[in-house]
Regions:
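Extracytoplasmic
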Residues: 27-47, 55-57, 78, 246-251
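Helix-loop-helix hairpin linking two adjacent transmembrane segments in secondary transporters
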Residues: 151-201
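Extracytoplasmic gate region of multi-pass secondary transporters
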Residues: 42-43, 227-255
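Residue-level signature of mid-helix packing/kink "hotspots" within the transmembrane helices
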Residues: 40, 68-76, 159-160
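Cytoplasmic helix-loop-helix junction between adjacent transmembrane helices
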Residues: 117-154
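Conserved MFS/SLC helix-loop-helix module at the cytosolic interface between two early adjacent transmembrane helices
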Residues: 73-112
């Protein structure tokens, strides 16, 4: 089905034309829940990897570094690309990256392969987050704070549950049990296809009705925007700096 045909099919559909689309927000929230649940499993299994392979704390830190670089630093690049070239089904593609990374991590037998595995999982997160945030805004119907809060609740819930599941599944049964989390990635990838279809329909509706893309706010100077962005980046950096230290090493202290 091409864009024009899809645009004809959805003509007059209120869930596409406007208004808050709670079904899409809920799906995005669930997808964020599953994505962040899987992401939080990686640091939770560090004790297993250290015991099995005899890694030093420096090597554990490098695993975290590679994971964070691929899952965080790449996000602006994927977001920039998505702004210029929207890809409605990229959310499912991101989950497929996560799926591949999980399966690799479950069978990884060397340090290099573990680094590759966590990098692939991180890339999946980098692909998911910018587009998922965009979809949440598109489905908000102007209620952007509500939409973002639903999106964030899903992610925070997943981050909280992931370590508990890792303790219940991976710690008793070993590294191979990581593959069980692949079921969550598969479910999320299939579920997010629904979002991709809605996203395609939304783009088709905008094209059919010649709805212009949102324009940047010109009432605020570019210099002020950059300063505000810099402050936000520094605040978030400081938060995740100590968060990464806690998630990487505090588990060993508890043990």
């Amino acid at each position: 089905m091409n864009i024009k045909t899809l645009g004809n099919k959805i003509k007059g559909n209120p869930s596409v034309a406007g208004g808050t689309v709670f079904s899409i927000l809920i799906i995005i929230g669930i997808g964020h829940f599953l994505n962040d649940m899987i992401q939080s499993v990686v640091p939770s299994i560090y004790p297993i990897l250290k015991d099995k392979f005899g890694f030093s704390f420096a090597q554990i830190g490098i695993i975290t570094f590679v994971f964070q670089i691929s899952s965080s630093i790449l996000q602006p690049l994927t977001g920039l690309y998505a702004d210029r070239h929207p890809r409605p089904y990229s959310l499912s593609v991101g989950m497929c990256f996560t799926l591949v990374g999980l399966l690799l991590l479950a069978v990884a037998s060397s340090y290099a392969l573990i680094l590759l595995s966590v990098a692939v999982i991180g890339i999946g997160s980098s692909v998911f987050h910018p587009e998922a945030s965009r979809v949440a805004q598109m489905a908000s119907g102007g209620r952007k704070s509500l939409a973002q809060s639903i999106f964030q609740v899903g992610g925070n819930g997943g981050s909280a549950l992931g370590p508990l599941l890792a303790a219940a599944i991976v710690l008793p049964f070993g590294q191979g049990a990581i593959s069980w989390f692949a079921l969550a990635a598969i479910f999320a990838a299939v579920l997010l296809l629904r979002v991709g279809y809605w996203y395609s329909a939304r783009l088709a509706y905008q094209m059919r009705n010649n709805i212009p893309a949102p324009q940047p706010n010109t009432s605020i100077s570019r210099r002020r925007k950059y300063w505000a962005l810099l402050i936000l980046v520094l605040l978030i950096f400081s938060k995740y700096f100590y968060t990464a230290c806690m998630t990487s090493y505090f588990t060993f202290f508890l043990i």
